[in-house]
Amino acid sequence: MILGTAKRNKEGAKPAPTRSYSSRQEKAVAKAVGGKVQKNSGATDFQKGDIVTSGMNSFLLECKTKTTPSASISIQKSWFDKNRQECLLTGTPHQAIVFNFGPDEENHYIIDEYLFLELLDHLNSLEENI
């Protein structure tokens, strides 16, 4: 490698910026949940989070992705604290952290215990009605 030049991948192209991986994940999640990707990844004063769904039981979603396939991801408490605070600011009743283990990998959703118990109760009531 010549000093002062960026390292190239095998095809000779520069690696994609981290933002492109995040954007791809956000668009896929928004499509899956029927939500809207927030402008500038929620960095504005009025639009918070990465994705917001609509309705009385709306969600504010914070997306986290790895830029290369990985067997693990480090979950940060600060992600939850920030998302919870943004829910309060926007009046959004529910929050979730969405993560994957690399580009084009399956997305996983982290919710709090209260919401999990609500989901479990709902699923059990559906089962009883069968």
Model segments located where?
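Catalytic phosphate/metal-binding cores of nucleic-acid and nucleotide-processing enzymes, i.e., regions
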Residues: 1-130
